[in-house]
Amino acid sequence: MARVRAVTVFVSPREWSRESIKRYVEEAAVRANEIAEHIRERIDVWTVRVALPPLPEGVDPIAVASAAFEAAEANGVRYIAAVHLNIGGVGDVKKVIDAIEMGVYGSVLVPRSDQAEKAARLILGISERDLLAATRFALVFGSSWPLTPYFPIAVQTRSGMGFGLAAFYVDDILASLSEYEELDVIRVVANRVFGLIEEVARSASQALGIDYYGADASLSPWMNESVARLIERMMGDAKMGSPGTLAVIRELNRIIRAIASSIDAIGFNEVMLPVAEDSVLKERVGEGRVRVRDLLLYSTVCVAGVDMVVVGEDMGLREVQGLVRDMYAVYKLKGFEVGLRLIRASGRKPGDEIQLGMFGRVPVAWP
């Protein structure tokens, strides 16, 4: 049964003192829980989240992270995206790393390729400090952040307060494949799911007096609710990574974008392939069938980016910097934002596995 993956409340503090941040985050957390309770009358909700805007110049990311995390946790919200910076404003890489390590989510916007080395050092520095912290941080390639409920790059890009939704629905598609042709079932299921989501979201907005920004129609996995499994079904049960994978992802993405055009859509509205969050994709990466370069290729046909990929010691500064440049090239090719969430495990090599908190055992990918 489809369910809401995330109720994300976006809030924009009028000032950035510690007390102001705590007050705004507390209000947003309370509202997020109220929205979730209203929606649960019709459809299950997995998580509630709060997202802040990019930090103004001169604001200390550590102070913001501390205040935001404390206020969110006190109000039952585990997911708080609080530290978003343009890479040009990152004067001290260590401060950003320290802030993310406090438990918040965050991102750095990379609008130009000449900042690739600093961006690579951020990824490597966070991974060296804490592998789980690296799962809470992403680079965003583009001229600005997208407005999406998906973490870690959920950023308030508007004034005031509003909310957006993301959904799980891949299992609904898989369960219905025997009833319809493949492409038809995706349209039928997605239209049904997002019709319901829009209905409950508008009801919550009206009942609670908070703006509904829209839904991100992206097709995303969580472990056995596997997008990679759907891709393989559409390939006639060939393994992901085989010839034909790119074409299937492109077709699937085309359908999702068409669905997004018929709803109040925000965010990416694309196929998402976060390796550590998809049990079938983990298997293919562990087998060496899907490598980092394959994921990079798939992102050219509108996968949201290279996401939740664990790499080993063979990916040092030069290699990560090269991948950053490649992701920037994908952004320029596509013309809209893409993300990179990379976890570098020291002392590990491709084919190894690491334990990564709630994501379980995750394979180290081949470049």
Question: Which residues does each PLM region occupy?
Answer:
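Anaerobic metallocofactor- and corrinoid-dependent redox/one-carbon enzyme cores
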Residues: M1-P367
